[in-house]
């Protein structure tokens, strides 16, 4: 019999599987709503400790109490957020534990329920419901218990456990899953019925009998995904969910104040919708990694990335900075369960991918599994290089590494790759024909030449002695090379095109014109204060970079100054410097020939379209760039002050080694170095360090503040260096070296130049960090 004094709704559905992660739902990451809102997540250390962070970006572990927290809370297996508070199921005893940030160690669960065991919990606006049972064993269903708080600002002032949520009919049911909102809870019974109860449950206005496989609740609404059609349905207050997206099915949902977000089944990307949300707002979710878990507060959504289990947060209603800056911690991808076999379309998370030798499971009980949904495809710019299996999800690989036809279509490069492959085969055939032809011709010439040797031995040697030799007058310490036998008067000495490191050559103007196709724009690599830089291929096939001075540079400098600078540049040789190979000064031109750097600039890898750099590569680049700058400051005589150290002047060679570029040809006044000049280079190098650590541009007009130093330094000085670390790439297990590097960058960009370290000290510190290595 159903008491009339209680309102509830029943929707009959069969064999329901629900994944929830939202307001009033259960997951490994959850958010408390309201002015006193905060996020918490379960870490991936295997201890199931809880880490929380609030709007002030104060990060704390509830299990490792800092000085401002008295006592501590137990490890937990699942979390659920309410209005200003969170509740959880403890991992060791399967009991309920609720808290707020005023005193996280105080359990707000009424004493009558504190010693009961629960397998799931769902926090609402000011009430909590939990399913009796053990999450780690036994049946996955049980009766539901509810309690209510009369005052959210003082939870202990009124506990109405025998309240409007107490219902004899509800007490008689066995539930598998539950969610809660403002004045209502909904649960899936053992028989597959969806039942909603509470004083406001009638406002949900359910209008169909869909079978939902995913369900989430907001304050005054519920959204679900149909198991059969994959279609999204929402009920209740339309201002919370707005227009629904027409997308492939979602495998998880999360609800905020006026928005919902979902993880797509196919590529595990996140999409958001709701009131006043457009396509650009929806796309504010990170697109460099899929997600395994998400949760929302009023206007912010946070999630656990599938790439590296790192937390990421973003604002949904606008593109400004997120309210919450999560700590650099790896978090659990899902809830622990006693399922031995995860089933079709699922895989069991393997803790070995975290590469911690002693870590075998993320669950307190090692017989438990974390079952996650398989991905089918990958985000744009990636292709699946392996498919999902019972022990691992599919692997997504950048399209830049696509090497065969299996990924051409996905990466949209089939036609290009096929054409390149055909052209490569044609070049190989032509090369083979040329080699065979030249070999035969050479053999014939040798036979003919041998027949004339006796007649040539009587020739005069004076012919050779009369051939004059001219050498380069600028590069005194370099090898001399034979010049053209018929030089043009009043022009520079012309050298052969063979180029080798250690020799600085003089090139013909015509030769460099041919090598650059007449200095055409399509061969242009870049532009600078000195002039233009062109990619060139010499007649012997060697790739070089040719820097051509513009008219202003030529007018404002004299020949003697040019020669003096050449004399210095000719002596510079270092593995982390873009070395000068030669020059040309014919017809008033000033052309410098440098080593060609095929992998472009550091700037383009950090901020452009070139491939992303992992942390090992970034640290190596920091160290190598510091070595190059140290060489200029301390080993060259006279010392060279760069005056323009920036990511676009750090180039990467064929082996991805960093080279300092664009440091020569300054005026004689500029060449006079001083300590203040060196400290200026150190400041610029500090900016480079901040760019590498954060992935942010030195000047970003779309951010406030625009300058990277103005943005990063206050955070570092407040002990929040983790907030600047780039989360778009897989983080190392131990981020402490990165935080130390942030502190080093802060020293380098100090306003008082006397407080900055010199480049030699920076180099020593970087060397120690790189030698210690990073653990991934």
Curated annotation (Swiss-Prot):
Catalyses which reaction(s): L-seryl-[protein] + ATP = O-phospho-L-seryl-[protein] + ADP + H(+); L-threonyl-[protein] + ATP = O-phospho-L-threonyl-[protein] + ADP + H(+)
Record localization: Membrane
InterPro entries according to UniProt: Kinase-like_dom_sf, Prot_kinase_dom, Protein_kinase_ATP_BS, RCC1/BLIP-II, Ser-Thr/Tyr_kinase_cat_dom, Ser/Thr_kinase_AS
Domain Protein kinase, residue spans: 519-776
EC code: 2.7.11.1
Bridged cysteine pairs (disulfide): 342-371, 374-388, 378-396
Extracellular side: 23-432
Gene Ontology molecular-function annotations: ATP binding; protein homodimerization activity; protein kinase activity; protein serine kinase activity; protein serine/threonine kinase activity
Function, in words: Serine/threonine-protein kinase with low activity.
Full protein name: Serine/threonine-protein kinase-like protein CCR2
Organism: Arabidopsis thaliana (Mouse-ear cress)
């Amino acid at each position: 019999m159903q008491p009339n004094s209680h309102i509830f709704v029943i929707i009959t559905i069969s064999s329901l599987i629900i994944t929830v992660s939202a307001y009033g739902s259960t997951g490994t990451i959850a958010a408390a709503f309201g002015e006193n809102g905060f996020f918490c997540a379960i870490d991936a250390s295997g201890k199931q400790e809880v880490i929380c962070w609030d709007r002030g970006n104060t990060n704390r572990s509830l299990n490792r109490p800092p000085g401002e927290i008295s006592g501590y809370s137990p490890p937990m297996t699942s979390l659920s957020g309410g209005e200003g508070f969170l509740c959880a199921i403890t991992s060791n005893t399967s009991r309920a534990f609720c808290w707020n940030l005023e005193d996280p160690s105080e359990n707000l669960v009424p004493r009558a329920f504190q010693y009961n065991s629960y397998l799931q919990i769902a926090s609402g606006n000011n009430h909590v419901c939990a399913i009796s049972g053990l999450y780690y064993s036994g049946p996955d269903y049980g009766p539901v218990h509810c309690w209510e708080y009369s005052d959210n600002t003082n939870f202990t002032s009124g506990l109405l456990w025998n309240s409007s949520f107490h219902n004899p009919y509800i007490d008689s049911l066995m539930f598998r899953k539950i969610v809660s909102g403002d004045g209502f809870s909904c649960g899936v019974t053992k028989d597959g019925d969806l039942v909603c109860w509470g004083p406001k449950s009638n406002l949900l206005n359910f209008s169909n009998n869909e079978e939902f496989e995913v369900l989430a609740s907001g304050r005054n609404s519920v959204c679900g995904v149909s198991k059969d059609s994959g279609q999204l349905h929402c009920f209740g207050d339309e201002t919370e969910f707005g227009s629904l997206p027409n997308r492939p099915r979602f495998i998880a949902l999360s609800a905020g104040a006026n928005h919902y977000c979902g993880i797509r089944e196919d590529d595990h990307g996140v999409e958001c919708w709701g009131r006043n949300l457009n396509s650009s707002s929806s796309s504010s979710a990170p697109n460099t990694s899929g997600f395994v878990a998400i949760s929302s507060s009023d206007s912010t959504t946070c999630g656990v990335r599938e790439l590296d289990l790192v937390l990421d947060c973003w604002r949904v209603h606008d593109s400004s900075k997120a309210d919450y800056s999560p700590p650099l911690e790896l978090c659990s991808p899902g809830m622990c369960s006693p399922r031995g076999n995860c089933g079709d379309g699922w895989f069991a998370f393997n803790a070995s991918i975290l590469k911690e030798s002693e870590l075998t499971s993320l669950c307190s009980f090692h017989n438990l599994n974390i079952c996650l949904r398989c991905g089918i495809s990958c985000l744009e710019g990636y292709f699946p290089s392996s498919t999902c299996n019972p022990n691992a999800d599919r692997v997504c690989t950048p399209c830049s590494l696509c090497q065969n036809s299996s990924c051409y279509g996905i990466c949209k490069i089939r036609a290009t790759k096929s054409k390149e492959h055909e052209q490569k085969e044609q070049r190989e055939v032509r090369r083979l024909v040329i080699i065979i032809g030249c070999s035969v011709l050479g053999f014939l010439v040798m036979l003919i030449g041998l027949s004339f040797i006796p007649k040539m031995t009587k020739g005069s040697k004076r012919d050779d002695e009369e051939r004059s030799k001219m050498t380069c007058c600028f590069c005194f310490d370099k090898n001399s090379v034979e010049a053209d036998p018929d030089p043009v008067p009043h022009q520079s000495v012309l050298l052969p095109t063979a180029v080798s490191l250690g020799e600085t050559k003089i090139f013909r103007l015509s030769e460099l014109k041919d090598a650059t196709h007449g200095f055409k724009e399509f061969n242009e690599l870049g532009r600078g204060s000195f002039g233009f830089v062109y990619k060139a291929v010499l007649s012997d096939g060697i790739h070089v970079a040719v820097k051509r001075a513009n008219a202003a540079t030529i007018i404002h400098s004299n020949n003697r100054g040019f020669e003096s600078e050449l004399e210095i540049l000719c002596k510079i040789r270092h593995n982390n410097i873009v070395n000068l190979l030669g020059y040309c000064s014919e017809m008033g031109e000033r052309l410098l020939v440098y080593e060609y750097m095929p992998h472009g600039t550091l700037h383009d890898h950090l901020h452009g379209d070139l491939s992303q750099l992992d942390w090992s590569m970034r640290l190596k680049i920091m160290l190598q760039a510091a070595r190059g700058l140290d060489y200029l400051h301390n080993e060259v005589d006279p010392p060279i002050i760069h005056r323009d150290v920036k990511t676009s002047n750090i180039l990467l060679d064929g082996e991805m080694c960093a080279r300092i570029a664009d440091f020569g040809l300054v005026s004689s006044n500029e060449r006079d170095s001083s300590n203040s000049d060196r400290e200026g280079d150190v400041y610029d190098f500090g900016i480079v360090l901040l760019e590498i650590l954060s992935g942010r541009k030195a000047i970003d007009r779309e951010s406030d503040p625009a300058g990277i130093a103005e943005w990063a330094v206050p955070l570092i000085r407040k002990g929040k260096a983790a907030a600047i670390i780039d989360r778009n790439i897989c983080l190392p297990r131990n981020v402490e070296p990165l935080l130390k590097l942030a502190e080093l960058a802060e020293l380098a960009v100090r306003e008082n130049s006397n407080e900055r370290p010199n480049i030699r000290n920076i180099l020593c510190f970087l060397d120690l960090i790189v030698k210690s290595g990073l653990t991934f």
